[in-house]
Amino acid sequence: MNKEMNRLKVVLAETKRTNRWLAEQLGKDQATVSKWCTNTSQPSLETLFQIAECLGVTVQELISKNSTKDHE
């Protein structure tokens, strides 16, 4: 069963950012960010807030299939 816990890969594409850029912003290894993007592992709640801030989105947009933009 493929459970997507986050939409990080989609949000990175929407914001025209790369795994490498995000890894640099967070001081994390690029392989770690790649695992988050493929839902192989998940970032901590604290890190989710940091990711949201870096990308200019809400945490909800990172984890919900129905982002707030879909409702506008």
Predicted regions and their residues:
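Short alpha-helical "recognition helix" segments of helix-turn-helix
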Residues: L22-A23, I51
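Residues in the helix-turn-helix
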Residues: W21, T32, E61
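DNA major-groove recognition helix of helix-turn-helix/homeodomain DNA-binding modules
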Residues: E46-E61
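Short, charged recognition helix plus adjacent turn
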Residues: N2, V10-V11, T15-K16, K35, ...
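Recognition helix of helix-turn-helix/homeodomain-like DNA-binding domains
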Residues: K28-P43
